[in-house]
């Protein structure tokens, strides 16, 4: 009979023979924290300012006239805005905030008009302040010198430069040197004739406003005549016209007085006489009988000749050089009418 073990020992042995309980599972490692999202750096841009409707370098304008500052911004970001400030004598006088319009190639632009009620320098500055989408950046400032519109013989400076530039743009014969000399005075008189203004060799606000609007251009009547001359007896001006009706040059002139009127009609230059003749006519271009386009010492603002078309002597040489034998000459009154009778004694 097998030997029985004591009870405590049996219990201990039974416990030893039982399978071991599994070890508790290890706790899972904590998940790694997500990396913080990176915010893209705000884009940096650039602004280029351009002043429009001003003349020369440095830009000049007339007080009361509107100038436009145009800003080109790159890169263009929808919804972004630019602050434009205007300074006079270092003091801020106006601030405007403007939006941008896309213009392609990743750029945008803005236009902002401004003017000055007094003479002096006005500076425009543009800044884009930082936003989440764009960093802060600015453009190079632009300065405009505003000048009085009242200039006359002997004046020099920005107002005269503006005057000469505007007259030249309308094809009046004028120097571009910033001096109100005799040639500038002649151009002003020619312009005033065409624009229907008082015939004085000076300027004012009205004249500059009309120039800015393009008033006072010469209206070509005979576009089909190609390269030709037109003499407007109503306004007392003469114009050289290129093919397709392009105005080349406009001059003041004086035609035949009422007792010896200039004949109207369509003619062609048939003879040219350089220099001065016995009657004091300079560089003459004859278009019918004794009627000629020529220089003369006296060219009043009204019809005063014996039938010829007088032009200032300083303009006679250039007209003589431009006109050829066979060049058409159209002489007319704007409202029609005029004398068709050829006077055999026509002269200066």
Cite the ranges covered by each PLM segment.
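Enriched for extracellular/lumenal, surface-exposed ectodomains of secreted and cell-surface proteins
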Residues: 118-137, 289
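Exported/periplasmic cell-wall-interacting domains
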Residues: 81, 162, 169, 218-224, ...
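Short, compositionally biased P/S/T/A/G/V-rich stretches that sit at domain boundaries
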Residues: 34-62
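Short acidic, glycine/serine/threonine-rich helix-capping segments at coil-helix boundaries
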Residues: 151-161, 165-211
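Solvent-exposed serine/threonine-rich low-complexity stretches and specific carbohydrate-binding patches
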Residues: 93-105
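Aromatic/hydrophobic beta-strand junction motif of beta-rich domains
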Residues: 65-75
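Conserved aromatic beta-strand anchor motif in extracellular beta-sandwich/beta-rich domains
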Residues: 84-88
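Secretory targeting and sorting signals
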Residues: 1-32
